[in-house]
């Protein structure tokens, strides 16, 4: 039997391929960044052709670096930036337009109109999502309304829609020469178009956005012994690999963190923050600004659901300090600079660059640094940036407790910012609970590998995955209750200052 599982992680800023053994240990990887296209304020795009070329390259190079071939891989999993949307021609494979990224806010008027006329309540009930620029439905409506010839091609069945998992899979399995047009339940649950109960595209929701059903991919389980597709032997893998796992990136991180029981939660720190709480087979409809989403579905088992708090700007706020303000030269310097001060000096930074996501959902908000005096330095701004990451997570944790009745005792964390010890200590202090990082921090790719490997029996079940999970580091709270309350009160005041800044009606 082959000894390894590979995962493609198609992310917001880069695409990587990682290869894992049965212990869940990484044996090889390759990663390439892709361009962030910013044509105007609030617009964020990716070049789909570049993404596919990067995907093929990282897969081929990871195999080459590890001196493995496709015969050494039992399966391939795909995980991806969710909501990012594109449309391409089924006959030529050419995209009609750049991919519109999840951070993009060009659809704010579409989202606002949904709430004004009552359609938003139907979307919340059926799809578990509030109308927002974040999700795919509005992006696809915008493409159909603004790209010449697209609607006519869509109605003829010539145009295909997908999130980036679907685009990557279609190309891996042959593209216009027979590629499969498939997504999984987790990605479909982020479109505002899928019914959470039926796990199928909902005709009423499609009608809200005037979307032809024939554009949409088939929805399948996240992990399936019947492959979603098989890589073509003339493609970048240079051989056939069954693709048996697909998960949106945050759901993949839940699986990688082995949060498989109701009440378990993880927080992924990347471009944005994404905090998910497993709610088991129960659909918990949020009354506190969270998303209800599919966590995963393995084979023909019932789906497992989650509550999610999606935060648009966390790691990218640190990038902003580097790229726009120039006060740090790299992400690691944010920690050393912030350590020069004992506290934030009264400064709060709310990085609402594209509005506020969970639990506020205010597209009229914009970023603000408040509380400045002549006493403050760039170190206070760096500290406030790290605190902003943690306070936004506190907003979500409190909303989860209100919705579910679950009060966390420990928070599992992963993603790039977890290498920042100061940020993780602040997170423990702000929440008042232990924060724990696993040995394998790349849990998104690992979760996709787990989904693929479970489908073919490489791992027998959840107990195998739990045995693989190991704690690397733990941070415990050091703040008093009074410190915690005072800090959070200042944060809530700062958040209010960012709202009603731009007109979205």
Swiss-Prot record:
UniProt activity-regulation remark: Inhibited by fructose 1,6-bisphosphate (FBP).
EC number from the UniProt entry: 2.7.1.30
Annotated pathway: Polyol metabolism; glycerol degradation via glycerol kinase pathway; sn-glycerol 3-phosphate from glycerol: step 1/1
Keyword line: ATP-binding, Glycerol metabolism, Kinase, Nucleotide-binding, Transferase
Binding site for ADP: 12, 16, 271, 315, 416, 420
Binding annotation for glycerol: 82-83, 134, 249-250
Residues holding sn-glycerol 3-phosphate: 12, 82-83, 134, 249
Binding-site positions, ATP: 12-14, 271, 315, 319, 416
PROSITE patterns attached to this UniProt entry: FGGY_KINASES_1 (PS00933), FGGY_KINASES_2 (PS00445)
Family, per entry: Belongs to the FGGY kinase family.
UniProt-recorded name of the protein: Glycerol kinase
Upper taxonomic lineage: Bacteria, Bacillati, Actinomycetota, Actinomycetes, Mycobacteriales
